[in-house]
Amino acid sequence: MSLLDYFKTKKKPSTAATAKERLQIIVAHQRGERDAPDYFPQMKQEIIEVIRKYVKVGADQVSVQLDQNDDNLSVLELNVTLPEQS
């Protein structure tokens, strides 16, 4: 029987499992934002405005994230998807 099981197609994860995984990602992201300093939303907006001064990008093309470690270390991560040059 195990030989036949080898040839069977693997089952897709259920929609409930997919929804649970997505929800866990959202909750983790919101927890990270909750621990951010009070000035972070304004700083994030100002960084995006400066980038838009020089490069035409949409809000969905700029990602600013603040990660904090237990060692009292903060990392500001900035990802910008630049448009292709013509």
Swiss-Prot record:
Transmembrane segments: none
Keyword vocabulary terms for this entry: Cell cycle, Cell division
InterPro entries cross-referenced by the UniProt entry: MinE, MinE_sf
A family per Pfam: MinE
GO biological process, one term: regulation of division septum assembly
Origin superkingdom: Bacteria
Disulfide bonds: none
Family: Belongs to the MinE family.
Function: Prevents the cell division inhibition by proteins MinC and MinD at internal division sites while permitting inhibition at polar sites. This ensures cell division at the proper site by restricting the formation of a division septum at the midpoint of the long axis of the cell.
Name of protein: Cell division topological specificity factor
Annotated organism of origin: Shewanella piezotolerans (strain WP3 / JCM 13877)
